């Protein structure tokens, strides 16, 4: 319990040290512009900034950036655009000209296409790590943190905020914090993902015969950021649909973030490709090499006997947002996501069970 008490002393501002300047796009930027910005800055999402007072922010939010000298409102963040928004927007059978038209759409028109974009949250820098964990364990992947909040006495999530500067806090930042504090969390992290109930046992998958355009369509409908690719059964299954991946051998991962490796012209020519071919080609493009620190397309997997410490090491070093759980033959058993990791660590800390400290 002593290590738990030390952990409780950390606040969100302790996670914001050395965070870089916020990467954003204006509301009149095209979807193509937003994609280029995400590629150039190696991020999976960008907030959308507009002139203050002209938009209702996502989820009724009012998150405003102030001029540091005058205190007047300079811009309002009206929502967030993610790689999954890109996938959802370009999904469909509209042909090449349709793709061009879709990528020319203003980003303001696609905010809220995916559940994450339905709200925009800020988190006060004085918020405790435990409260931060609660928020990020409920499907919220990232929040804005004011660097000089005008609401110093308020902690927790807010839909209304004003500050002269913001930074982004993501689930990965919190997982990296767990990694850095592994000595304090040893009692929890040394348990297996099975013991901690961190595994999602049902996983939808693409078959190895699915095409890129079908993969995009499936992910858009299911609102999934990534899906495993499993060996096709050869039994006449529909490769245009997601299948139950249980016990099938995993051969790859198709992720919305893979699109960061594509120029528009490249994406256009690759849409008819087999999805597995696509994920194998992506690492060899110069654009993808520049946009990721992960060499090649290594399949990141764990076992039911893997410890949470091992899984956290995988996600932080490989920079992946989920780990497929497989058996000794590579058969898919489930997955562990960043949301799952945060939820089980928080639950274990709150339980105060003696064997977890």
Curated annotation (Swiss-Prot):
Keywords: CBS domain, Repeat. Disruption phenotype: No visible phenotype; probably due to a complementation by PV42b. Shorter siliques and reduced seed sets in pv42a and pv42b RNAi double mutant. GO terms for biological process: embryo sac development; stamen development. Expressed highly in rosette leaves, cauline leaves, open flowers, developing siliques and dry seeds, but at a low level in stems and floral buds. InterPro entries: AMPK_gamma/SDS23_families, CBS_dom, CBS_dom_sf. Residues 16-97, 113-185, 198-273, 293-351 form the CBS domain. It comes from the Eukaryota. Belongs to the 5'-AMP-activated protein kinase gamma subunit family. PANTHER family: AMP-ACTIVATED PROTEIN KINASE, GAMMA REGULATORY SUBUNIT, SNF1-RELATED PROTEIN KINASE REGULATORY SUBUNIT GAMMA-LIKE PV42B. Plays redundant role with PV42a in regulating male gametogenesis and pollen tube guidance. This is SNF1-related protein kinase regulatory subunit gamma-like PV42b. It comes from Arabidopsis thaliana (Mouse-ear cress). The gene is PV42B.
């Amino acid at each position: 319990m002593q290590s738990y008490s030390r952990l409780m002393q950390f606040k969100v501002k302790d996670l914001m040290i050395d965070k870089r300047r916020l990467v954003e796009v204006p509301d009149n930027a095209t979807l193509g512009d937003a994609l280029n910005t995400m590629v150039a800055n190696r991020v999976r999402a960008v907030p959308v900034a507009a002139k203050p007072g002209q938009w209702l922010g996502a989820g009724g939010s009012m998150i405003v950036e102030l001029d540091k000298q005058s205190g007047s409102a300079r811009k309002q963040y009206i929502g967030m655009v993610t790689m999954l928004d890109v996938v959802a927007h370009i999904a469909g059978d509209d042909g090449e000209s349709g793709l061009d038209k879709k990528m020319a759409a203003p980003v303001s028109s696609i905010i809220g296409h995916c559940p994450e974009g339905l709200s925009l949250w800020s988190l006060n820098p004085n918020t405790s790590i435990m409260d931060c964990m609660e928020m990020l364990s409920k499907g919220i992947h990232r929040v804005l943190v004011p660097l000089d909040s005008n609401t110093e006495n308020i902690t927790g999530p807010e839909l209304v905020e004003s500050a002269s500067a913001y930074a982004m806090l993501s689930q990965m930042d919190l997982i990296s914090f767990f990694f850095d504090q592994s000595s304090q969390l040893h009692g929890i992290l040394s348990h297996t993902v099975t013991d901690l109930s961190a595994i999602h046992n049902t996983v939808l998958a693409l078959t190895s015969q699915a095409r890129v355009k079908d993969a995009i369509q499936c992910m858009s409908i299911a609102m999934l950021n990534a899906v495993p690719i499993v060996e096709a059964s050869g039994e006449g299954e529909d490769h245009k649909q997601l299948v139950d991946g249980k016990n099938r051998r995993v051969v790859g991962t198709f992720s919305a973030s893979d699109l960061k490796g594509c120029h528009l012209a490249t994406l256009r020519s690759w849409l008819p490709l087999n999805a597995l071919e696509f994920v194998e080609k992506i690492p060899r493009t110069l654009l993808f090499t520049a946009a990721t620190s992960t060499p090649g397309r290594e399949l990141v997997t764990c076992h039911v006997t893997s410890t949470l410490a091992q899984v956290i090491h995988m996600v932080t070093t490989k920079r992946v947002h989920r780990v497929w759980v497989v058996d000794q033959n590579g058969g898919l058993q489930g997955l562990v996501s960043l949301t799952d990791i945060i939820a089980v660590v928080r639950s274990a800390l709150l339980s105060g069970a003696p064997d977890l400290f």
